[in-house]
Regions:
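Terminal, non-catalytic protein-protein interaction segments that mediate quaternary/complex assembly
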Residues: 1-282
């Protein structure tokens, strides 16, 4: 059984069995027909993945690796806030007539800040510290910038990464670990999507910094299942998980800004039937 499937199944069961409902409360999200999008939610969900043992992609249904990678590179590498730079239409609902989502996501990672070592944006600061001061406890990014929230077409869901490097006994290479903080996570539409893309990011950064990957800890303040997703989730978690596939990252690339969506793949990826036309709350 894929470990990622096991984590997902247990999380969804916990939400369904022990979560609380927002039905009847004042909620922002709504369905396309204007109906309020209520959820069953759990506070403070923490999921751990050891990337050195397994790539955390679901086999219950397919997670689109290249599209997920394209999105994380759009944010972290291109530092873009324009959906025209993407190969998918996931963000279309939040873009203006020019394709911009405002001062959100990639925009924030591209803002340069003054450090003692010079002007750098947050991504370059992370790479600099991982290479030059790997045991620092200050290696992190944060894109939830309050002064710019009014100019964001949507607030960041996954908003912070904290990196931590360890030296395992008997290992020559350092190990890169990270905590992904997320204020809100849609279990069906976004959970494994986010897990996969940040796992890819960690693999890329580890390779660039001559490290090996370790643990990724996913901290979710509000993990939820939307009311119209409940029957879909109930069916999904009854499926038989398959073995986890092997992750491949182009070993010839050692510059983070040279990676493309074509430099990643999963080998031996078997998965259950895809779920079509998932309703998305906006």
């Amino acid at each position: 059984m894929s470990y990622a499937d096991n984590v997902f199944i247990n999380m969804c069961k916990d939400i369904l069995e022990n979560g609380t409902s927002t039905e009847g409360e004042k909620v922002r999200p709504h369905w396309e027909d204007g109906t309020p999008a209520y959820t069953i939610k759990k506070f403070g969900v923490v999921n751990r993945y050891d990337l050195s043992k397994e790539f955390p992609i679901l086999t219950l249904r397919r997670t689109a690796l290249k599209s997920a990678t394209d999105e994380i590179l759009w944010i972290w590498q291109q530092k873009s806030n324009n959906i025209h730079d993407l190969h998918s239409h996931i963000w279309d609902e939040w873009a203006d007539e020019n394709g911009s989502i405002g001062k959100a996501y990639g925009y924030q990672l591209g803002v340069k800040h003054q450090y003692k070592e010079g002007m750098m944006d947050q991504v370059d600061r992370v790479i600099y510290d991982l290479k030059n001061n790997p045991f620092s406890r200050r290696i992190m990014t944060n894109i939830y910038v309050h002064q710019d929230l009014h100019e964001m077409n949507l607030y960041p869901c996954a908003y912070s990464m904290t990196f931590n490097v360890t030296q395992k006994k008997g290992e020559d290479k350092l190990t890169l670990n990270a905590v992904l903080n997320q204020r809100s996570n849609d279990a069906l539409a976004a959970n494994n999507w986010n897990v996969v893309q940040y796992a890819v990011l960690m693999h890329m950064l580890a390779q660039v910094c001559d490290m090996q990957v370790g643990e990724m800890v996913h901290v979710i303040a509000d993990a939820h299942i939307y009311d119209r997703h409940v029957p879909i989730i109930k069916e999904l978690i009854t499926r038989e998980p398959k073995e986890a596939p092997k992750f491949w990252l182009n070993p010839d690339i050692h510059d983070f800004y040279r990676f493309t969506r074509n430099d990643v793949k999963v080998e031996g990826y078997e998965f259950g039937p895809q779920i079509e036309n998932i309703p998305i709350a906006i």
